[in-house]
Amino acid sequence: MYPTLVPSTYLESHLWFIELLAWWQGRVNATDLSRHFAISRTQANKYMQRYRALFPDNLDYCKTIKGFVPQPNFSLRCISGDASEYLDWLDKQGSTVCNSSAHSSHQFDHQPITHTSLTLPKRQVSPVIMRALVSAIRTRQRLEIGYVSLSTPDDQGRVIQPHTFVKTGLRWHLRAYCEKSSVFKDFVLSRFRGEPELSGPARHDPAEDLGWNTQITLTLQPDPRLSAAQRQIIEHDYQMQNGELKLPVRAALAQYLLQELQVSTKFLAGSGEAQQLVLVNRDEVKPWLFDS
């Protein structure tokens, strides 16, 4: 169930936090709020009361563990229920998140929730260039700027008309109309060079970007070289339906999605265990793939 509230306001962020801990950690109390948001116990209690007033069937106080626990008919109202939402929150808290209301003498203490994540190398983007790109998008302007690529390593001037920043896993890029190539294309942010200069209103609207505005579906299946038992594992991993995973995506982003899933569209890896997923509608989506 998708949330009916999102943590976009001060109140909603507290309600979201209450529900997040209650659902995923099985308990929440005023001390959790007080420590996480650096507020008084009185304020924290008011937020707990507010949550219970809004969603009276969700939480019940348990004297034994000194906290509110989910009731059997708990209904998600502020969180999505997707484990990645909780894991993303954990990631933002640091390498260890403890049960903040636990004490070493309490019989219901829990072990700290430990986790870690990879630290990816940063790609340098000049603040001057970044501010110019933001300004060009906000004001719908053309931008004169230098750019290098592996095929043209010498700094070449470009006039672009940017419309969207895109994160594709390891890096950020910019979707923009390129006047040199006369097409909408992707530019890696760290490869812009020089002193950018705004040069008048953009002449191409994002609505003209066919690759950006075309929705396609990638159909994936477990590698057929896997055994039936192995295929079932992959199907469960990705919550496949009838042995297939269908992923709707903007056509311009299809290749990036496949790369993140480590799905090769050129050749199969040496074994099914290494490949795991295969794209079964390659001919259908081939016009949008740039490594086919």
Q: Locations of the language-model features?
A:
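Core beta-strand-centered patch of the WYL/Sm-like small regulatory domain
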Residues: 110-224, 229
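Bulky hydrophobic/aromatic content
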Residues: 70-144, 260, 267-270
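Short, hydrophobic/amphipathic alpha-helical patches that form generic packing surfaces
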Residues: 16-20, 85-89, 252-263
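Short, basic/aromatic recognition patches that contact phosphate-bearing ligands
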Residues: 1-80, 220, 272-292
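Polybasic (Lys/Arg-rich)
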Residues: 213-292
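Conserved short hydrophobic interaction patches
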Residues: 54, 195, 260-264
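A generic structural signal for beta-strand entry/edge sites
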Residues: 65-67, 142, 171, 244
